């Protein structure tokens, strides 16, 4: 990835393996997070977000949802995201942790991946809760202190759901092309 680029390529690396198999791959990151119909719009759609706006320089989405208690929203995140991800070999598909600031969620902010540090951006947009993939201990403490609930639903689980949407768009645009979504790509962690 661009955050940690390859210094050299060997037979164990995906580009070599793809070439040997005569396959190609499309790899997208931040541009797909911010794109219309991209990672965070798909994530917002899973939670039936209305009146959506962008935040975090266009990457995240914030909008209205049907009022729900934080524990129920966390459980819904676990169930809905699991339905959009490849199931692990063992353990739960999605592990969710949350901080409940003590008020129901009417306005939700979502940002996939490692978005926990963006809690202040979510607060500035009037969100009651930030749902992201990863948040560290200090993000959780600060968010709760400032009145924002926080749900960390896993990096993989918040990003993988977009693959079906991208595949559908490619199939519609290029009907002669066989478009496959990996059934092997899974969260690298095994959860207890």
Predicted regions and their residues:
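Hydrophobic structural segments
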Residues: 1-192
